[in-house]
Curated annotation (Swiss-Prot):
Catalytic activity annotation: D-glucuronate = D-fructuronate; aldehydo-D-galacturonate = keto-D-tagaturonate
HAMAP family named among the record's database cross-references: UxaC
Protein name: Uronate isomerase
Cross-referenced PANTHER family: URONATE ISOMERASE
Keywords assigned by UniProt, alphabetized: Isomerase
Source taxonomy: Bacteria, Bacillati, Bacillota, Bacilli, Lactobacillales
Enzyme Commission code(s) on record: 5.3.1.12
Any one biological process term the GO annotation gives: D-galacturonate catabolic process
Length: 465
C-alpha cells in the first residue's frame, strides 16, 4: 500500500469521495498560539530548524524519549545537528502523530517526498533551506498558501493589541487575525496574580480593592478587546470546579492573597468559580465564544521547567474527581444567572469524553436558534491524534449532533501546523465513510458531503459570527 499519497488515511472508497468535497475548503483556525508580531513583520525564513523545531514541544518530547541530549534539543548545538537529531528520532516515531504531521509538512510545504532519515538528513536540510529562500517562505506566505481565512491568537488581557491593529489596517493581507482574551493570571493560584492586579489597575486607571472593582477592571479590558475584533476568550483549568462563596469572603480572600497569603485548595476553587462566572456574564454580553481547556497537569519535570520555563514538553493529562457534578453545577449556575455564553469545551483526558458530551447536551437550549450552542471541542494536545479525534467524534455523535461540530483548530505555535487541518479532514472522511460502508447511514454523498463541509469549515464561520 502506498504511503502519504493522495489517498493517505482514506481507508475506503466512500472516504475518498467525501474527501474530494472538503480537501480544498479554506481554513478557519479559531484558536492558536501564533505571534501576531511575526505575522505582521513577515520575515522570510532561512533555516528549517527555526521554522520546524523552534518552540515545538511535541518534537522535543519525542527527542528526549529517543535519548537525544538537551544540547541538541533546546541547547546550543548547531542547527544542522539539531535537525539530524530530530531525523534520527522521526524514523523511530511510527504510530505517533508527529510522524504523520512531519511527513505531511515535508511533502506538502517543501516538496520533500522521500522519508527523512538520519542518512539523508544533511542533504534534505540544505535542500529545504535553499527552498525557503528561493520561494520566500514567510508567515504570510504559509498562511496564504494554506487558504487560512481566520486566525484566532491567544493574548494576555493587558496586551495593547498593537500588532493586531496593524494587521487589521494592512489591506495587502486578507486573512483576519483576531485576538483572544486569555486571563490565566486572574486566578489567585497563579504566581503572577498580585502583579497582574497592580498592572490591571494601572492599565484601567482604576483602584482595585475588592472583588467587585477587580471584575469591573476586567470588564473594561474585555470591552477593549471587543473593540479590536476579539471574538473569543480562552482559559485553561487544571480541574472543573464549583464552590460558591459570598462576596465578603471573596473580598477578604483577595486582600489576603495580595498581602502574600498562599490560598488553600477550597479558596482556590471558590475564586475560580466566582471569577469565571463573572467573566462568562461579560463574555455573553459581548458575544464572545468562551473556550475552556481543562485537564492538563503542567510542568511536572521541575528541573526542566526551572531551566526552560513552561510549554517545553513536560506536561501530562490529568484526572479529577466528580467532573460530572462540578460541570453540571457550574453550567446550571451560569444558566440561572443568564450568563451562559457560547462555549467550546476541550477535554484533555479522553476517558471523560462521554461525560463531557453528555453534560453539554443538558444545556443546549437557547433563545437565538444557535445550533450547537455548547460545543465539545476537538481532541486537544495529547488527544490530538487519530484515535483521540475518533474518540471525541464518537462521544459527540452518540450524545449530541456531530453535524453541528465546529471542527478542527491547530492550537499551535507553528506556521506549518495547518497540515493538521488536512489530517483531520482525512480522518473525518474515513470516519464518515465507514458509516456508509457499514450501512449505518444512507449512501447519500450529497448529505454526508454537506455534513463534512460544515464540520471542516462552514460551522466555524457561522458559530464565530
Amino acid at each position: 500500500m502506498a504511503f502519504n499519497d493522495d489517498n493517505f488515511m482514506l481507508k475506503n472508497e466512500a472516504a475518498k469521495r467525501l474527501y474530494q468535497q472538503i480537501k480544498d475548503q479554506p481554513i478557519f483556525d479559531y484558536h492558536c498560539h501564533l505571534d501576531p508580531k511575526e505575522i505582521f513583520e513577515d520575515k522570510v525564513y532561512d533555516n528549517i530548524v527555526d521554522l520546524w523545531l523552534g518552540g515545538d514541544h511535541y518534537k522535543w518530547r519525542l527527542m528526549r524519549a529517543n535519548g537525544i541530549s538537551e544540547e541538541e534539543i533546546t541547547g546550543s548545538a548547531s542547527k544542522l545537528d539539531k535537525f539530524k537529531a530530530f531525523a534520527r528520532t522521526l524514523q523511530r516515531s511510527y504510530g505517533n502523530p508527529v510522524y504523520h504531521w512531519s511527513v505531511m509538512e515535508l511533502k506538502n510545504v517543501f516538496g520533500v517526498c522521500e522519508l527523512l532519515t538520519e542518512d539523508n538528513a544533511e542533504e534534505i536540510y540544505h535542500r529545504i533551506n535553499a527552498y525557503l529562500v528561493e520561494h520566500q517562505i514567510s508567515p504570510r506566505k504559509l498562511i496564504a498558501d494554506s487558504l487560512v481565512r481566520f486566525i484566532g491568537t491567544t493574548d494576555h488581557p493587558l496586551d495593547d493589541l498593537a500588532w493586531h491593529k496593524r494587521l487589521a489596517a494592512d489591506d495587502t493581507f486578507e486573512t483576519v487575525v483576531a485576538p483572544t482574551f486569555r486571563p490565566d493570571e486572574a486566578f489567585i493560584e497563579h504566581q503572577c496574580f498580585a502583579d497582574f492586579v497592580a498592572r490591571l489597575a494601572q492599565a484601567t486607571g482604576r483602584t482595585i480593592t475588592d472583588f467587585k472593582s477587580f471584575i469591573a477592571a476586567m470588564e473594561e479590558r474585555i470591552a477593549y478587546f471587543a473593540e479590536n475584533g476579539c471574538k473569543a476568550s480562552d482559559i485553561s483549568f487544571t480541574e472543573i470546579v464549583f464552590e460558591a462563596a459570598e462576596p465578603e469572603q471573596l473580598d477578604h480572600l483577595m486582600t489576603r492573597v495580595l498581602e502574600g497569603y498562599q490560598p488553600q485548595p477550597l479558596e482556590i476553587k471558590q475564586w475560580q468559580t466566582a471569577v469565571f462566572a463573572e467573566l462568562c456574564r461579560v463574555y455573553k454580553h459581548y458575544g464572545f465564544v468562551t473556550q475552556v481547556h481543562f485537564g492538563a497537569l503542567r510542568n511536572n519535570h521541575s528541573a526542566i521547567f526551572n531551566k526552560l520555563g513552561a510549554d517545553v514538553g513536560v506536561d501530562s493529562l490529568g484526572d479529577q474527581a466528580a467532573l460530572a457534578i462540578n460541570m453540571n453545577r457550574l453550567l446550571d449556575h451560569l444558566v440561572q444567572r443568564d450568563s451562559l455564553p457560547k462555549m467550546i469545551w476541550y477535554n484533555l483526558n479522553p476517558s471523560y469524553n462521554i461525560t463531557v458530551a453528555n453534560t453539554l447536551a443538558n444545556f443546549q437550549a437557547n433563545e437565538n436558534g444557535i445550533a450547537g450552542y455548547l460545543q465539545f471541542g476537538a481532541g486537544w494536545w495529547f488527544a490530538d491524534t487519530k484515535l483521540g479525534m475518533i474518540s471525541q467524534m464518537n462521544a459527540l455523535a452518540e450524545q449530541g449532533l456531530l453535524a453541528n461540530f465546529v471542527g478542527m483548530l491547530t492550537d499551535s505555535r507553528s506556521f506549518l501546523s495547518y497540515q493538521r487541518h488536512d489530517y483531520f479532514r482525512r480522518i473525518l472522511s474515513t470516519y464518515l465513510g465507514e458509516w456508509i460502508e457499514e450501512g449505518e447511514v444512507p449512501e447519500d454523498y450529497q448529505a454526508l458531503g454537506s455534513m463534512a463541509k460544515d464540520i471542516a469549515y462552514n460551522n466555524a464561520i457561522q458559530y464565530f459570527s
